[in-house]
Structure formats: structure tokens, C-alpha cells
Amino acid sequence: MERHQHLLSEYQQILTLSEQMLMLATVENWNTLVDLEMTYLKAVENTANITISSCTSPVLQELLRQKLRSILENEIEIKRLLQRRLDKLSELVGQSTRQQAVNRTYGQFPDQALLLGETQ
């Protein structure tokens, strides 16, 4: 029974971490999200090793199934928010590239070039 409690506790830790990651993604705190992701991945790896040998009770399996469902829902939402951020960053990179092209083009003119509307 103690092993089952430990396993349930490990899954709860993963769920808590995924909820924290979802909150960080929602408020666009990307740096902290990336830092927390390493802790999350280690917790998942440790729990996977425990789960293989421990999951025999149907009641425990149902409890874990509920936690896994919530974890997966959080993962889906985090991925959606990350994709939105990636799209925004791609747009900004595109704008920057276009601006650099404009700057290179207009930078070819001599410093004394007349601006539109100026007289000599």
C-alpha cells in the first residue's frame, strides 16, 4: 500500500508541475516555463520507472488514469500556447528581415540625399 501511495504522490507531483507550466504559458513567462520543464521531465522519467512495477490495483489504476487525463489536457493546452508564441516570434522575425532589407536598400544612398519635399 505504501508503494501505491508513493506512486500516487509521484503522479500528483507531475500534475502539479504541469499545472504550473500551464499557468506560466498562459501568462507568457517563457523563461521560467523552460526552466520548470527540466524538473517536469525528470519527474516524468522517475515516475515511469516506478509505474512499470507498481500498477496492479484497479482502484490505483483509475486514480492514475484521472491524473494522466488532466496532465495530457494540460500538455495539449501548453503546446497550443507555445505554438501561438512560435507563430508570433516567426512574424517578428519576418518583420525584422523585411526591415533589414529596407534599411540595406535605403542605406545605399549617399548621406546627403534629399528627403522627399526638401529643396536644394
Swiss-Prot record:
For the keyword Cytoplasm, the answer is yes
Residue ranges of region Required for homodimerization?
Answer: 1-50
What's any one GO cellular component for it? cytosol
Q: Where in the cell is it found?
A: Cytoplasm, Cytosol
GO BP annotation list: bacterial-type flagellum organization; negative regulation of bacterial-type flagellum assembly; protein folding
Main subcellular location of this protein, as a coarse class? cytoplasm
Here the disulfide bonds are: none
Known InterPro entries for this protein? FliT
Region span, FliD binding: 60-98
UniProt keyword terms in alphabetical order: Bacterial flagellum biogenesis, Chaperone, Cytoplasm, Repressor, Transcription, Transcription regulation
Q: Tell me the protein family, please.
A: Belongs to the FliT family.
Task: Give the quaternary structure.
Answer: Homodimer. Interacts with FliD and FlhC.
Annotated function: Dual-function protein that regulates the transcription of class 2 flagellar operons and that also acts as an export chaperone for the filament-capping protein FliD. As a transcriptional regulator, acts as an anti-FlhDC factor; it directly binds FlhC, thus inhibiting the binding of the FlhC/FlhD complex to class 2 promoters, resulting in decreased expression of class 2 flagellar operons. As a chaperone, effects FliD transition to the membrane by preventing its premature polymerization, and by directing it to the export apparatus.
Name of the protein described by the UniProt record: Flagellar protein FliT
* Naturally occurring in which organism (per UniProt): Yersinia pestis (strain Pestoides F)
